[in-house]
Amino acid sequence: MSQRPNTPQRDRPTEYRLSLSSNASSRRSSLGNNGRDQHASNQTMIEKYVLPQLQELSDSMVTLDGNMTHMNFIHESIADLNEALSALLYGLMCNSWCVDFPNISHDTPHELKLIQRLEELKQERQALQAKLKPKELTKGSILPLSRQPLSRGSQMLYRDENVPGSTASSNVNIDINDDEDNTAASFVSNPTTFKPQMISSVGASTDFMGKQTVGSASSKLRRRSILHQIRNNAAIGTIPNTLTGITPGERKRSLAVSAKRIPILAGSSTTAGSASSANRESTNTEPALPNRVVRTRQRTYNPKNLASRPPFR
């Protein structure tokens, strides 16, 4: 027959152990009842010192339990906020990486240095342009002596000092705009027998820019009537240097000036008579050909002498 193992002996048949889940009032009542039975002498000390402290400890544990519960709620709320806030910050960071904001300067000193350098380069460029501009003007303005323009009215004539065969005339005043300002002169005039060329020596020359100007100066002159040309060329006492090769016989007097007496030169009649006789001989006689009779032509009019002409015309 087997025997039961020995069990430890208990001092009291019933032993009360405190549990965390037990009620405080039941613990106090059980302790009080047990204390009255066993420790009657110490009842006053327990009720006076131990029980109030235990009651305070129990109340503190209840308060701690409530505080921990609230702290758990706060922790959960902070965790949720942390996740949302971290997601927001991550999104903003990704947006700043992917999108370029031109108005936000990332490196302010470097940007300021670049702006200052650009301003210095701009000022240096303006200074160089200001230095080069007078040189370009001097290159374009300096011309050879034969190509220096002479301002006469609104037109530009050139010097012919270096051109062989040309003579420079002094005190030559040609007012080309006189035809537009002066209305006192007559509008009837005898035409000339030549074509006046204002600029003949520079017809086929090279300008200072290297371009060939064949008659460019004369072609740019405004086309004028015969009256204007005669009044500007033949009615002036002095002849321009470009018209020195014209004989007085080729020029005809203009009616725009006042009436003058034509002087009868001594050799004019003799020269005219000899010229007319030579002309008659050349026209009336024809070269003799074989088997052909030479006949003389007879004129039906008598040539008049210069003395029979009126003194004015």
UniProtKB/Swiss-Prot annotation:
List, alphabetically, the InterPro entries matched.
Answer: DASH_Dam1 (IPR013962)
The processes (GO biological process) annotated in the record are: attachment of spindle microtubules to kinetochore; cell division; mitotic sister chromatid biorientation; protein transport along microtubule to mitotic spindle pole body
**Where does this chain mainly localize?**
nucleus
Its localization reads:
Nucleus; Cytoplasm, Cytoskeleton, Spindle; Chromosome, Centromere, Kinetochore
Q: Which residues form the signal peptide?
A: none
Where is the stretch described as Disordered?
Answer: 1-39, 268-313
Q: What highest taxon heads this organism's lineage?
A: Eukaryota
Point out the coiled-coil segments of this chain. Answer: 110-139
Q: Name one GO cellular component term.
A: mitotic spindle pole body
The UniProt regions of compositional bias labelled Low complexity, in chain numbering, are 17-35, 268-278
UniProt keyword list:
Cell cycle, Cell division, Centromere, Chromosome, Chromosome partition, Coiled coil, Cytoplasm, Cytoskeleton, Kinetochore, Microtubule, Mitosis, Nucleus
Q: Which family does it belong to?
A: Belongs to the DASH complex DAM1 family.
Query: What is the stated purpose of this protein?
Result: Component of the DASH complex that connects microtubules with kinetochores and couples microtubule depolymerisation to chromosome movement; it is involved in retrieving kinetochores to the spindle poles before their re-orientation on the spindle in early mitosis and allows microtubule depolymerization to pull chromosomes apart and resist detachment during anaphase.
**What is the annotated quaternary arrangement, including any partners?**
Component of the DASH complex consisting of ASK1, DAD1, DAD2, DAD3, DAD4, DAM1, DUO1, HSK3, SPC19 and SPC34, with a stoichiometry of one copy of each subunit per complex. Multiple DASH complexes oligomerize to form a ring that encircles spindle microtubules and organizes the rod-like NDC80 complexes of the outer kinetochore. DASH complex oligomerization strengthens microtubule attachments. Within the complex, DAM1 and DUO1 may form the microtubule connections. On cytoplasmic microtubules, DASH complexes appear to form patches instead of rings.
Kindly give the PANTHER family that the UniProt entry links to this protein: DASH COMPLEX SUBUNIT DAM1
Q: What is this protein called?
A: DASH complex subunit DAM1
Query: What lineage does UniProt assign to this protein's organism?
Result: Eukaryota, Fungi, Dikarya, Ascomycota, Saccharomycotina
